[in-house]
Structure formats: C-alpha cells, structure tokens
C-alpha cells in the first residue's frame, strides 16, 4: 500500500513502523519501546534547501531520493531476533513509500551485545536479499508487518 507523501518526515516514518508486531512477543514495536519517533532521522529531497549538502555531494544527484535513518532498541541486550526486526522495519517502509529511499537501520548504541556486527549485517544489500529468500524468514517478516485494525 503506497502512500502519497509530498514531503516525508519522521512522524510519517514512525506511523509506518509503529504497529509492526514483534516476532517474539504479542505486542507492537512501539508498545515494547523498540522504536521511538525521536530515533528517526529523515532528509527528504523536497526538504533540502540550496545550502544543504548530503554526504558532500551535489544535491542534484539525490533528486527523487529520501534518506531515512532509524535506530531501534531490542527488548534485551542478547535479542537473537534483532536482524529480523530490522528486516521488518525495512520491508514495511519499502511497502509504503512511493519514492526511492535510502534506508539505514541501526541498533541503538549500547543496547545489544553484538550491535556492531548486526548493524553491518542489517545494512548489507546482499545479506538482506539472502535473508528474504529464506521462506521461514520471509513468512515471519510478512506476518509481523501485516496490517491489523487499530
């Protein structure tokens, strides 16, 4: 379900991901305090003025792009489903946003025992594709991001 956004902001992104169900607990990521609006950064090309410079490149290179950075906090420091939660967040955003987006997802600093290793994994395109090719992981992600009536 692609939404029609003129300019995307962190409130829009939070509204998209807040109702994702946790893969282990019968609650949403918002209810478990895994995601928070304040942990989201969005730079939408429609919101860039002439003095802004993303990644020290010319803004024209980014016409039509939206940059989204999301931090999340697993429920426990040894959460084995942190990569799955990141996949759910990424797939939910991709399902809703109409424009090309660069999405970066990270575990909030100091909240997981292997956060550096997992952060590399959850932002590696090849690993993301490989994970979603696994039928069990794919079905779990689809189940977690499925819309319910709220």
Curated annotation (Swiss-Prot):
Keyword Electron transport: no
Swiss-Prot/TrEMBL GO biological process terms: chromosome segregation; protein maturation
SUPFAM superfamilies the UniProt entry points to: Fe-S cluster assembly (FSCA) domain-like
Keywords, sorted A to Z: Chromosome partition
PANTHER family noted in UniProt: CYTOSOLIC IRON-SULFUR ASSEMBLY COMPONENT 2A, CYTOSOLIC IRON-SULFUR ASSEMBLY COMPONENT 2B-RELATED
Family under the similarity heading: Belongs to the MIP18 family.
Role noted for this protein: May play a role in chromosome segregation through establishment of sister chromatid cohesion.
Name of the protein in its database record: MIP18 family protein FAM96A
Protein's organism: Dictyostelium discoideum
Gene field: fam96A
């Amino acid at each position: 379900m692609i939404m029609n956004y003129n300019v995307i902001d962190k409130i829009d992104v939070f509204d998209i991901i807040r109702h994702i169900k946790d893969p282990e607990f019968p609650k949403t990521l918002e209810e478990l305090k895994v995601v928070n609006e304040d942990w989201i950064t969005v730079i939408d090309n429609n919101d860039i003025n002439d003095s802004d410079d993303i990644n020290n490149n010319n803004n024209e290179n980014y016409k039509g792009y939206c940059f989204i950075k999301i931090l999340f906090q697993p429920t426990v420091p040894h959460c084995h489903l942190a990569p799955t939660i990141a996949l759910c967040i990424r797939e939910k955003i991709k399902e809703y946003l109409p424009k090309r987006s660069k999405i970066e997802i990270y575990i909030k600093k100091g909240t997981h025992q292997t956060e550096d290793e997992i952060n590399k994994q959850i932002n590696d395109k090849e690993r993301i594709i490989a994970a979603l090719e696994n039928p069990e992981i794919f079905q779990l992600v689809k189940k977690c991001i499925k819309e319910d009536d709220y």
